[in-house]
């Protein structure tokens, strides 16, 4: 579907969509291999409406693989595509679900974490960065994309790196620990240091270093904290 068609077809839905006012949108943020997908699956098993990253769309065009193999060529293209597909995923989720929605990352981490990091490194040049900022800001405002809270799965870069190697996605073969350190610093600046950007939302920080797959007590504690966090968003 073309961009104009997506905007027009969803604008009328947004005008009467009570989800935007009565239900909460929460994103799970964290580094590569922080444990987000695992947490998303646990939440899904416990009855939450969850929305996973559109990873297969990125793989379908081989963009994720191209990004890691030749970032100076593909960084801007990938981040533009990621922002677009995540926007569509967000809109589809609002139209399909009648309750709180938990997203695996958001358009905001696309911008404040990944696109910013790639610009800092120099893989996205200043011209591309200005274009990215202009259209991402416009699209976010036009589509009224909002999140009401963030669950920050804070996992140390060393642990993330070990998990990344263990899961052995071929696209990530060239990812170095230095890049994970940079992404960790970006998350800390965004989520742990007073959320300095243009929107401020409550943040629940969860330590992602430990085991919450086989440790049932820890899993129960995390689920309880998330339940309380979402409940407090309504107060």
From Swiss-Prot:
<feature type="binding site">
    <location>
        <position position="105"/>
    </location>
    <ligand>
        <name>substrate</name>
    </ligand>
</feature>
<dbReference type="InterPro" id="IPR031314">
    <property type="entry name" value="DNK_dom"/>
</dbReference>
<dbReference type="InterPro" id="IPR002624">
    <property type="entry name" value="DCK/DGK"/>
</dbReference>
<protein>
    <recommendedName>
        <fullName>Probable deoxycytidine kinase FPV151</fullName>
        <ecNumber>2.7.1.74</ecNumber>
    </recommendedName>
</protein>
<dbReference type="InterPro" id="IPR027417">
    <property type="entry name" value="P-loop_NTPase"/>
</dbReference>
<feature type="binding site">
    <location>
        <position position="53"/>
    </location>
    <ligand>
        <name>substrate</name>
    </ligand>
</feature>
<feature type="binding site">
    <location>
        <begin position="30"/>
        <end position="38"/>
    </location>
    <ligand>
        <name>ATP</name>
    </ligand>
</feature>
<keyword id="KW-0808">Transferase</keyword>
<dbReference type="Pfam" id="PF01712">
    <property type="entry name" value="dNK"/>
</dbReference>
<dbReference type="GO" id="GO:0004137">
    <property type="term" value="F:deoxycytidine kinase activity"/>
</dbReference>
<feature type="binding site">
    <location>
        <position position="79"/>
    </location>
    <ligand>
        <name>substrate</name>
    </ligand>
</feature>
<comment type="similarity">
    <text>Belongs to the DCK/DGK family.</text>
</comment>
<keyword id="KW-0547">Nucleotide-binding</keyword>
<dbReference type="GO" id="GO:0005524">
    <property type="term" value="F:ATP binding"/>
</dbReference>
<feature type="active site" description="Proton acceptor">
    <location>
        <position position="104"/>
    </location>
</feature>
<feature type="binding site">
    <location>
        <position position="68"/>
    </location>
    <ligand>
        <name>substrate</name>
    </ligand>
</feature>
<dbReference type="InterPro" id="IPR050566">
    <property type="entry name" value="Deoxyribonucleoside_kinase"/>
</dbReference>
<keyword id="KW-0067">ATP-binding</keyword>
<feature type="binding site">
    <location>
        <position position="172"/>
    </location>
    <ligand>
        <name>substrate</name>
    </ligand>
</feature>
<feature type="binding site">
    <location>
        <position position="110"/>
    </location>
    <ligand>
        <name>substrate</name>
    </ligand>
</feature>
<keyword id="KW-0418">Kinase</keyword>
